[in-house]
Regions:
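Consensus positions within tandem repeat domains that build extended binding/scaffold surfaces
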Residues: 33, 42, 51, 60-62, ...
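Bacterial N-terminal signal peptides
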Residues: 9-17
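Leucine-rich solenoid repeat scaffolds
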Residues: 128-165
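Bacterial N-terminal signal peptides that target proteins for export
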Residues: 1-8
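Glycine-centered beta-turn/loop sites at beta-strand termini
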Residues: 29, 37-38, 46-47, 56, ...
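Sec/Tat signal peptide C-region and signal peptidase I cleavage site
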Residues: 20-26
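Alpha-helical transmembrane bundles and membrane-interface segments of multipass inner-membrane proteins
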Residues: 26-28, 32-34, 71, 80, ...
Length: 165
């Protein structure tokens, strides 16, 4: 019988010698104020009850704000951000980001890329004033919402709209 141990040890040594460039991470928050810092890969972070900070970095991140007043910063990839029940502050990144709001009075700032921002319920503020040649879409949902958008962008359901060129 031939022993496979030397072969397995050689494979393990090769795998350990190869540096890990990025490993996607999934993490869930607690009832405290949690901080999640992204990796270059596509991460998934879930805030919970505290006033959390969720920061994407690279890749297509999935960021879920919780019940607190959270700060969510999207990264360079095409990120999906879901607001929570608190008054969240969301800053879109460089990719074509998607945002779905929760029940609080959210502040949402679009970034570079063709962002789709849906604020949901609550009295929200949306700022999309970067002229990057991409068309952003803003749906303010219900509530008394304020939007500052570029003349190329699309908006619906926003009560107070300022268009800049």
């Amino acid at each position: 019988m031939v022993s496979r141990t030397p072969i397995l040890l050689a494979i393990a040594a090769l795998l350990l010698a190869v540096p890990v460039v990025a490993q996607a991470e999934t993490a869930r928050g607690t009832s405290h104020a949690d901080v999640f810092a992204g990796t270059p890969a596509g991460d998934e972070y879930w805030g919970y009850r505290g006033n959390d900070v969720l920061r994407g970095k690279g890749g297509g991140d999935r960021l879920f704000a919780g019940r607190g007043a959270d700060l969510v910063v999207a990264g360079r990839g095409a990120d999906n951000v879901h607001g929570g029940h608190g008054g969240d502050r969301v800053l879109a990144g460089r990719g074509d980001d998607r945002f779905w709001g929760g029940g609080g009075a959210d502040y949402v700032r679009g970034g570079r890329g063709a962002d789709r921002l849906n604020t949901g319920t609550g009295n929200d503020t949306v700022i999309v004033k970067r002229d990057d040649g991409k068309v952003d879409s803003v749906d303010c949902g219900s509530g008394i919402d304020r939007a500052v958008i570029h003349s190329e962008d699309n908006e619906v359901n926003c009560e107070d709209v300022k268009v800049i060129s």
